[in-house]
């Protein structure tokens, strides 16, 4: 079975073709970073308009890359949520229209299920059960995963997501949008221990997160110590260490609570090298394993949507002809496969 995947939930247009026998056949991606850079963040209307311009040409490019035509596609998967409603509607409308025209089934895919299953695209894929740490610009969640659609929310951020905190703190440090990856690069030049940031909510039981206070702590630290290059790097280092430590502490608790030996990290922030290193070290000490996707599959992409859609379609799930999206969509509401 070959599935075309369409991802348009935010500011990346991702198109891919996945085959259940041979794997990923094509992967096309267009990022809108330059489009939104002047505004310091994603402008929903601009994002939607750009998806309109890019989605069909990228589908054509993906089919060409895979040396396929429309008749070779057995199903279409599109991101139906969560995300920006206008952006989601572009992918959903194109996906449903193509499926109808080609006479194949279409399936709406949950964006975060796509991220959660992205490590399955790798040769060393995780087996169930595992704890998933989903860390992105919009989500920070710990989830018990015992099968496809068998998701139990263990904890989540009560305010800012980890990726959002990275971007906001980067802005305080004078870095351009998107600042998260730039902050991480700056942190590599920082001196460990010059500044010590708190590890929010780690001094109390539970698996929820809170990152908004770190942004405030960073702002106060910047005000008190100036903005010379080394000080900025030292603050970036202290901030990143605090976020990474917090994620590691909570992940360890989730593993202890569930008794699982496998940890999956997914979402844009899972590409962070410091986080990967910290969690790998933690899992080695515990005699467990950590799994993650290659960097290009950590951020939004069509490959994860094509793969998740393939699994859903093979289980017999497909949507009605109507086009609907869900900007807010709890992962736990997904049906078991």
From Swiss-Prot:
Superkingdom of the organism of origin: Bacteria
Pfam families the record matches: TsaD
Gene Ontology BP annotations: tRNA threonylcarbamoyladenosine modification
SUPFAM superfamilies for this protein: Actin-like ATPase domain
Cofactor note: Binds 1 Fe(2+) ion per subunit.
Keyword hit for Oxidoreductase: no
GO molecular function: iron ion binding; N(6)-L-threonylcarbamoyladenine synthase activity
UniProt cofactor(s): Fe(2+)
Enzyme Commission number(s) from the entry: 2.3.1.234
Catalysed reaction, written as an equation: L-threonylcarbamoyladenylate + adenosine(37) in tRNA = N(6)-L-threonylcarbamoyladenosine(37) in tRNA + AMP + H(+)
Chief place of localization: cytoplasm
Keywords: Acyltransferase, Cytoplasm, Iron, Metal-binding, Transferase, tRNA processing
Subcellular localization, as worded in the UniProt entry: Cytoplasm
Key word tRNA processing present: yes
Annotated binding of substrate, by residue: 134-138, 167, 180, 272
Gene Ontology CC terms, in alphabetical order: cytoplasm
Transmembrane segment boundaries: none
Residues that, per the record, bind Fe cation: 111, 115, 300
Primary role: Required for the formation of a threonylcarbamoyl group on adenosine at position 37 (t(6)A37) in tRNAs that read codons beginning with adenine. Is involved in the transfer of the threonylcarbamoyl moiety of threonylcarbamoyl-AMP (TC-AMP) to the N6 group of A37, together with TsaE and TsaB. TsaD likely plays a direct catalytic role in this reaction.
Family, as annotated: Belongs to the KAE1 / TsaD family.
UniProt name for this protein: tRNA N6-adenosine threonylcarbamoyltransferase
Organism phylogeny: Bacteria, Pseudomonadati, Pseudomonadota, Gammaproteobacteria, Enterobacterales
